[in-house]
Each structure stands twice: as C-alpha cells, then as structure tokens.
Amino acid sequence: MVSIEGRFNDASNFRIAIVVARFNDLITNKLLSGCIDCLQRHGVDTSESSPQLDIIWVPGSMELPLICQSLASKGKYQVLITLGAVIRGDTPHFEVVINESSKGIASVARENGIPIIYGVLTTDTMQQALERAGIKSNLGWNYALQALEMASLMKALR
C-alpha cells in the first residue's frame, strides 16, 4: 500500500497567489494577515519584493473565480488561496454569492489541475466573521496551511 500526503516543511519553491475580496475588508484583511503569517513561518518569502507570493485584490467574492481562472491559466502558480467574507443579510443575495463563487472556484481548480483553497467565510453575522478572522482564531492561517499541504501533495503526485 502506498500512502501519499502533503508536507509543510519545504515551501521554498512554491509560487503562491492570494486573491482577496475587498468587500468586508475588516474581515479579509485579518484573514490575509493570518495567511501571510503562516506562510512566512513555513519558509515562504513574504517580503514586498517576493518572487514567491503575489496578492491580488478584487472587489468582492463574485469576482474570485474569474481572477483565479486568469491566474491558473498562466501556469505560474502551484496553488491559489481565495479570501473573502460573505455575511448573510435580509435578501437572497448571500446564497447567490456563495453558491456562484464556490462553484466557480471549484470549476477552475478542476479544469486547470491546480489547488485553489476556498477561504471565503460564510457567516450569519459580523460577530461570527470576526471570531473566525482573529478574535477566537484566524482561519487565514488554516487556509495557508491547506495551501502548502495541497501544493506539496500535487508535487508528490506528479
């Protein structure tokens, strides 16, 4: 039996893009901070002039799939991370945004054979989003760790 899994100890050769939705930036900035902290602690160059890491800002979570498609098609990155925060309101817009963004991102990942970490928080309240972006824990850290594991796993499978 063969057992293959991703590792977190050699991120020095990975090219990573983080695509961040500006909408609800109080939350997405915190997620980005947690994400960068994790990447840095695992050996990724996160400096301003980093050849390893690019950060791309989009207006909202609906725009994430299109930009992921553009980035994935370049073949430059081993993994993409999406960050967003969609908070339920009084209209069905919440369901439309999360359904379309998640389906679009999953489709891009399958079509291009690149891992894309879905780091879009979907919460009922701002308080719940804040708890997941730093008050209780920062899921940005988890998304970065998932990205490193998936990039490593894909490398091992090739």
Swiss-Prot record:
Keywords: Riboflavin biosynthesis, Transferase. The active site is at residue 93. Pathway: Cofactor biosynthesis; riboflavin biosynthesis; riboflavin from 2-hydroxy-3-oxobutyl phosphate and 5-amino-6-(D-ribitylamino)uracil: step 1/2. Pfam families: DMRL_synthase. GO terms for molecular function: 6,7-dimethyl-8-ribityllumazine synthase activity. GO terms for cellular component: cytosol; riboflavin synthase complex. GO terms for biological process: riboflavin biosynthetic process. It comes from the Bacteria. 5-amino-6-(D-ribitylamino)uracil binds at residues 23, 61-63, 85-87, 118. Its EC number is 2.5.1.78. InterPro entries: LS, LS/RS, LS/RS_sf. It is an enzyme of class 2 (transferase). It catalyses: (2S)-2-hydroxy-3-oxobutyl phosphate + 5-amino-6-(D-ribitylamino)uracil = 6,7-dimethyl-8-(1-D-ribityl)lumazine + phosphate + 2 H2O + H(+). (2S)-2-hydroxy-3-oxobutyl phosphate binds at residues 90-91, 132. SUPFAM superfamilies: Lumazine synthase. Catalyzes the formation of 6,7-dimethyl-8-ribityllumazine by condensation of 5-amino-6-(D-ribitylamino)uracil with 3,4-dihydroxy-2-butanone 4-phosphate. This is the penultimate step in the biosynthesis of riboflavin. Belongs to the DMRL synthase family. This is 6,7-dimethyl-8-ribityllumazine synthase. It comes from Prochlorococcus marinus (strain MIT 9211).
